[in-house]
Amino acid sequence: MPTPSMEDYIEQIYLLIDEKGYARVSDIAEALSVHPSSVTKMVQKLDKDEYLIYEKYRGLVLTAKGKKIGERLVYRHELLEQFMRIIGVDESKIYNDVEGIEHHLSWEAIDRIGDLVQYFEEDDFRIETLRAVQKANGEQSK
């Protein structure tokens, strides 16, 4: 299993390849706000652990294992963002909140959150009911 830091890199590499068709060390460094030398070290570790294939000065490609995990990590991130929106978290806080919790949840918890997101999205009335509860609770705490 990849570490949380490895997950961040795999997720970002997956997104860059999906968006641009490739991922360069400089692109990864910029996206993660880290030094290129840090990216090179991590990419070498990810290569050793068979998440990607890296050739110095030629670039990198995700292996089947890396693609599968990258896809799952992007799904997890997007699902948690959906969940935050459903429960009414302010849009400006969602990204940081998701970044803060995504590595600490089990895949079972992610699957259950997926069930909850599906439950709310299947019927708008459920979200309206949640908003009414939140409004009532907000007024009670004033």
UniProtKB/Swiss-Prot annotation:
Mn(2+) 2 binds at E11, H77, E99, E102. One of its GO terms (cellular component) is cytoplasm. Mn(2+) 1 binds at D8, E99, E102, H103. DNA binding is strongly activated by Mn(2+). It is found in: Cytoplasm. Disulfide bonds: none annotated. Homodimer. This is HTH-type transcriptional regulator MntR. It comes from Bacillus cytotoxicus (strain DSM 22905 / CIP 110041 / 391-98 / NVH 391-98). The gene is mntR.
